[in-house]
Amino acid sequence: MRLSKAQYDEIALFISTLRPTRQCMKRLKERFPCQSQSTLLSIFSQEYQKMIKRTHAKHHTPEAVEMYYARYLNEVARDPKVPILLELANEVDFSPALMARTVLERFLQDHDGQPPTKPVLSSMLRDPSLIPDPVLANQVHLCIINDCFNGPLVDGIKHAIGHEHEVLLRQKLKEHNLAFLDEDQLRLKGYDKTPDVILEVPVAVDGHVIHWIESKASFGDEASHKTYLHDQFWSYWNRFGPGLVIYWYGFIEDLDCNRERGILLKDGFPETLVMLGSCMAQTDEHGQHTKNCLNETHQETES
């Protein structure tokens, strides 16, 4: 789903008025009924992550950490069954999973006499039963399962969704008899940074030849797309030539501005492909990657 910048800004502005609860998605869908649930959820998640980054520092000052830890100890001494950390996170407008991480790290510093390593901390957040204090273990568990946008549970879901769309991309390519190499095959060939697939025979999409396809199970907003361009897409272009990025949950239409330079954006598998029967790589006078292609055949794809 392609959105104009004005449409995206309207959604982002409304999101800024919502708290990150399960009920917020119902309100968001009611406000923007024409947008898909997946698109709205992806945009909400991205906007929430931006807010977390903006406010991260104030929640991690020594004073804030000591205040959160003292509040936890005082409240849990009164009634260990009350979800203290979850309530505290909501009170100070902080991610429950990050609140749990902050207090757990402070607890382990007292318990072990030194700050925990990141692997130890991460393993306890993934499996709270590893936490030596059963009361804190339960408090951390409640934070993890009630955080809709952060934490190991959410990370696992995002990873699964990303993998699901990579599988979908490979299925689509196989349905259209397009030979390709995936990331695992490319790593075996010694490539360290690769797109999800490289086409063994390039195809044309909307009149542009592509050699690779990258799958993104997210919405393409300005911040994420700028980062991907810098960290991934231009590197792929330099190494493999022009390519296609699929933002399965849509993108801001103004971002599709690098087609002539060799990076196309789509919100799904292309509806029409031009199969290139015989291609010879060329480089034009400006150093741009081009293809001289013969024996073209058109293939319509199913939506």
From Swiss-Prot:
Superkingdom as given in the UniProt entry: Eukaryota
Answer yes or no on keyword Nucleus: yes
Report whether Nucleus shows up as a keyword of the record. yes
User: Where does the UniProt entry say this protein principally localizes?
Assistant: nucleus
A GO cellular component annotated for this chain's UniProt record is: nucleus
List the subcellular locations: Nucleus; Cytoplasm
Q: Which UniProt keywords apply?
A: Cytoplasm, Nucleus
Q: Which InterPro entries match?
A: CDIN1
For the biological process aspect of GO, one term held by this record is: erythrocyte differentiation
Q: Which Pfam families match?
A: TPD (PF14811)
Tell me which PANTHER family the record gives.
CDAN1-INTERACTING NUCLEASE 1, SIMILAR TO CDNA SEQUENCE BC052040
**Role:** May play a role in erythroid cell differentiation.
Q: What is this protein called?
A: CDAN1-interacting nuclease 1
**Native species:** Xenopus laevis (African clawed frog)
Per the UniProt record, the lineage of the source organism begins with:
Eukaryota, Metazoa, Chordata, Craniata, Vertebrata
